[in-house]
Amino acid sequence: MENDKLSPTSLAFIALTNEYCQLVENCGDHGREGMVEALIKLLPRIYITVTDLEPNLEYLDAFISQALDEASYDVVRDNLSALMGEDDAYLEVFLDDMKYSDTPIATSISENLADLYQEFYNLLVSLRDLNTEEQRQILGMCKENFVEYWGQTLCNVLRALHSLSVANRDYYDNY
C-alpha cells in the first residue's frame, strides 16, 4: 500500500514548486526587496529537494506537457522585469559560449525566473489527475531536466539575487 503514495520528498518538491509559482504570479505584492528575500530562501530549498528525489528512468508513457503558452510566459517575465527594474540584467559566466568570448554575455533575472516558472508550471499541470506511478515518472523527467537544464539556471539566478540582496544597505540592518 505504501507504493501507492508519493514519497515525502516528492510531496515536498511539488509543494515547493507550487509555492514558487504562486510567489512569481503575485510578484507585485512583495516589492523588489521582499521578492528577492523570498526567492533567496525558496530557491535553495527547491535545489536541495530535487536532488533528493529518487531517479526514475522508466518514463516511457509519461511526458511533461507544455501547458504554459508564450503570452503567459511573457506576462510573467515582463512583471518580474518591471519589479527588478534596472537591476534585472547581470553578466552570465556559466554559459558554454562564454569560454570562447571576449565579450561578456548578459542575461536577466526576470528571464531566468520565468524559465523556472515555466518548468514548474508545466510540471504541476502535468501531475494533475495522474496516478502515483505516472506522477513518479513525471518527477523523474523533471529531475532529468534539472540535471540537463534548469538546475544551472536556478544556481545562476540565485547568484544574481544574492548580489542584489547584499548590495541593499538595509540587508545588514536585519542582523
Task: List each model region and its residues.
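Charged, amphipathic alpha-helical oligomerization/scaffolding segments
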Residues: 8, 12-22, 38-45, 49, ...
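Acidic, proline/glycine-rich low-complexity IDRs
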Residues: 104, 119-175
